Amino acid sequence: IGQSLVFAILAPLGREVGLREVQITSIIAVSALVFALASPHWGRLSDRVGRRPVMITGLVGYTVGTLIFTSVFYLGLHGVLAGTTLYLVALLARCGQSLIMSGTNPSATAYAADNTSRGERTRTMAKLGTANSMGMILGPAVSGALATFGLLAPLYFAAMLAACAAILVWRQLPLTPEDQLTPRSQLRRLRFTDPRLRLFIVSAVGLFIGFSGIQQTLGFQLQDKLSLTGIATAQMTGAALMVSAAFTFLVQVTVMQRLKLEPGSFVRIGLVSLLCGAATIAGFNDFGTLAVGMAFLGTGLGLCMPAISAGASLAVSTEEQGGAAGLIAACPALGFTVGPVVAGALYQIAPPLAPLFSAAVFYIVLVNLVIATRRQ
């Protein structure tokens, strides 16, 4: 919920304090790079010390980081910070937050892998994805409602939710038994170039380069094409993201639970859906057409990510689950490092170029996956 709140509100909030489109998208991109670099380390640490302490650390880091990030924009709205100073302080705050919160995702994914059989791995990852989808559905809806109280209200709410989640994990999640922990001397450092994981990593990074390019320019597209105010933009962006998340949720509770396909098959079908969505969004002039495009995007994301997580988990040993989860958790962040910056720059040249760039990325990933699968 918290992340989708931020994505829905950041574009209009950034414009409200005088930041340019490239500055706004670069805050996401640079902090995503920090997230990507830190995630594998947190994943390996969860193999050594257990899932619960790493998960709690990530959630507490998200809580504190969000409060600091929100305070920076509060100062910007009241004229205390402005221009380059505001941009640099906001960037630093977001990067610090990303450094710590990146422990949550790999530890949660590894915990799910610890407690499921190989035959049920894809379905289990889909269930974990369903929880993410519920957050993506609720987040934009909550963001739109809270935006009526001001553009900062959704961010304070996100911090409160993360704090509650940290308490819940501390109270309810059991510690990892000592005999299931991997000593430091036995930890194997997985790399992004590991041949067992390479195809999954390339596909996931490409997927999120394209998806983030659309997501992070969506607010600009809506505000400029439909002539919306800042608050109305936040509400409409939230509604569009909610459509996407709703279809992700539906796919994960129906298709992913009933069809027994190989992970690669799910990914190929999902990429076709993502390609259709990006092409539709490139030509929208009303919210109805945009909603259709977002539905395609949500469907594609719902098919791809659980399959990629499951495929990577099945490709490694029990002792490497945390490391593999950390690498896969870094992939969305790596995508967000590239996608928003390139799409933001293209948007300033011509708005339709941003989603067309995403469509081109989805097509390249799909072709690469088909060729690699045939070789195997």
What residues fall within each predicted segment?
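Cytoplasmic helix-loop-helix junction between adjacent transmembrane helices
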Residues: A93-N132
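C-terminal ends and interior cores of transmembrane alpha-helices
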Residues: V60-G83, S273-N285
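Short amphipathic helix-loop junctions that connect adjacent transmembrane helices
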Residues: A8-V22, Q216-M236
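Helix-to-loop junctions at the C-terminal end of transmembrane segments
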Residues: A38-R51, L250-P263, Y347
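Hydrophobic core of transmembrane alpha-helices in multi-pass small-molecule transporters
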Residues: H78-G103, T289-L303
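Juxtamembrane intracellular "pre-TM" segments in multi-pass secondary transporters
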Residues: P174-V202
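Transmembrane alpha-helices of Major Facilitator/SLC transporters
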Residues: L33-L37, M236-L259
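C-terminal transmembrane helical hairpin of 12-TM major facilitator-type secondary transporters
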Residues: P263-I308
